[in-house]
Amino acid sequence: EKVKIKDLKTSIISIVNFVLVSERKSLDVINFLFCDDNTIIDFNKKYLKHNFETDIITFLYDDTDLSESDIIISLETVNRNSITYKSSYLIELFRVIIHGLLHLCGMEDNTKSKKTVMRKKENYYLKLAGLIN
């Protein structure tokens, strides 16, 4: 899928703003780092003590005057997931972005039931964005 970078950036900003307003969450700064598997493995090792790739890592820093966060996304893993789940790359990318935002809003996915709730919320926002039916 070919998408102009400007259009993609605008779409990401729109979904970020929409999710945060809908979830009643205010953040001063969200930094996105789009990277490869090796980079996200390095972050996983350093901060989470995992030695494997993940599609996303989300950090919220509340020890500063600003409400600041980092969302790190492996585009290689997003691509593999889009193939595995028979989804378009863009839908999977936006699903992962929404997933990270939901973590910043306080949602967890550390149990099966919490994963189900989070997946429903991801689908809700993907539908509102017109990305899925």
What is the role of each PLM region?
Residues 102:
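Catalytic acidic motif of RecA-like/P-loop NTPases
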Residues 1-94, 105-133:
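An acidic/histidine-cluster motif and surrounding catalytic segment
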